[in-house]
Each structure stands twice: as structure tokens, then as C-alpha cells.
Amino acid sequence: MQLAGCLALVVAVLAVIVHSWRFDHKPRIYGDRLPRRVLLPSQRQVQRKIIVYHNFFRTRVDPKASDMLALTWHREAARSAQAWANRCKLLAHDSISGRWIDDFGSCGQNIFISTHRVPWFFAIKTWFLERHNFTYGSRGNSLMKVGHYTQLVWAATHKVGCGFSECGGHKKYFSYVCNYCPIGNHLERLGQPYSRGKPCSGCAKDCNRRRLCTNSCWAADLWANCQELYRTWPNWLCRSQHTSQGRQRRDNCKATCTCAGKIK
């Protein structure tokens, strides 16, 4: 009798579960169930979501970052990302000139492709999950294995613009492209894409409610050794604009010359 009672109870519970399950509530994630319009970065709402997702993951690094800048949308970066997404080159990256943005130079680029339409959150999270291949502070990190992650969480990057395209041909797929300015993934610092420490401890009072820094620089250095040059010859580098060579030096080291106290 006890066994019969237990079986009856199990059957009753299963009946309740089956009855209460709504088959019309399947996740609207894959295929045509996800409308194309909710993926188009030309839409302001989509732009806001992309920014929120990026900044969410930038606060989830381990170890914590003391100097992680908040990302904001950049129209020109989005335009170049969309142009490249439209080319449908699978996972190949755009050229240096194709990613060039005034004041920032060539920007970084992450690409995600899928055989189905998936939310931007899924694409960005896929890049972030490369953190499992990453060791902070190590010289042994491989750009091929962690490059999407390190660009996503590169502290000095503070502008992003993205593009989305449906690619035809024999096998249809969807291309998600984001360009990041200023560019990250400098090989000599690949193991330290940000400074380790308490969130916002590296930006004093320039911190938002998400504990991300806001003291970004409006431009980027185009020469790799601008800061070294400034330490030795500051006037020669930044204050000799009376000659064409002086103006050229300053133009190539805008961040060093004009953004004291900023994260760059």
C-alpha cells in the first residue's frame, strides 16, 4: 500500500508539471524567433544594451581592476564595424586602415559568428569566457586564445561601436563585429590588460556607480614610446609646435601631451 501510494503521488506530481509547462514559452534565442531589429546596432536601444553588457563584464574581471574605464558608444567605430560585418569575411579581421578612427588610430576588433541569430549578450559573453584561458600577470598568455577577452577588458579602451550582418552564400551565418578604441592587446602587456586593485582606486574621484573609471582621454598615442620620450624631452615632444616636426610629434603623442591625470 505504501508503494502504491508513492507511485500515485509521483504520477500526480508529474501530471501537475506537464499541465503547468507552457510550450509556447520556449526561449526566444535561436533562429528566426529572434527578430532582426533587436540585433541592429543602428537602433539606440540595441546600442544601450551593447554598452551595458560590455560594462557588466568589465566589472567581472578576476582579479579586480583598479583602473577599468567605462565604455561609451562611438559612432565612427560603429560605422567601420558595420562596414566590415557587411563584407562577410567570417572571422578574418579588417585592415589597419579599415579600423582607423581620427584621434585614436587603428582600433581593436572582436568578431563572433553564428549559424543562428543570438542575442548580443551571448556574443559578448562568448568573448568574455576566454578568461578561462587567461592568467593575469603571465607572459605565457596566447593572443589566439585570450585576445577577445583581453580586448574586451582592456582598461584604457573606452569607446566601442558594433555592427551586425546576415551573410548569405552556400551556408548562411550571422556576423557580429565590435571595434574598440583606443586599441588594446599590446603584446608586451597582454598579461596585464588592466591594473590589479580595488575598483576605482586608480581613478580617485572619477568613478561611476558601477565602479568603473570615467577619466578617459579624448585621444590615443600613435607612437609606442610617447611616454618614454616625454620623461626625457617633454618640451621637445609636446611644446615645440612652431615647427612642422614639432606639430607632428605632438599629433602622434596626443594622449601623453594633453591628458595628464587621465587613464591612457
Model-derived regions: residue spans:
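Mature extracellular or exoplasmic CAP/SCP-family domains and secreted bioactive peptides
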Residues: 2-264
